[in-house]
C-alpha cells in the first residue's frame, strides 16, 4: 500500500496538479504548491481571472534560462529552492506576463507605453526596466503581492504603479494584505 501511495504521488507530480481549470502546478515541495495556490488566489482576490498557465518550480536557475523566473507561451518557471517574499514576487511577475499575453490588447499596450513614457513593448535591445512588457509584469506583481518589496522598475511610486495597474487590468488597485 505504501509503495502504491508513493507511486501515486510521483505520478501526480510528473503530470502536475490542477489548482483551477487551466492552472496546473508542477512541484515536488508542498510549500511550492502552496505558493502557487497563494498566487492564483491573489489574482482572484483582486477580481481577475488567473491566467491559464503551467507553473513549474526548479531548484536552480537552469530551468529559467539562468534567471530566477521565466515566462513563455502559457508556462512559467520559478527557479529557487526557497519559498519567501522574493519567490512570491517572482511567481506573480511571471504569471503577470502570461496574464498580459492573454488579456491585454495591442491598443491597451500602446496606451500603457504612453502612460509609462516608454518606447518599446519588449525589444531585447532595450534594458529590462524600460520595456513595457517587463514593467507591466512588475506592476501586476507589485499590485497583487504583499507590497513589501519595491517594484524593480523606474518611476515606481505607488500612484504611478496604481495608474499602470488600472490601465492594464481595468480595475482599481486592490487593498494589500
Regions found by a protein language model. Name each.
Residues 56-88, 101-102:
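Active-site scaffold of zinc-dependent metalloenzymes
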Residues 46-58, 107-113, 148-156:
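Surface-exposed patches in mature extracellular/periplasmic domains of secreted proteins
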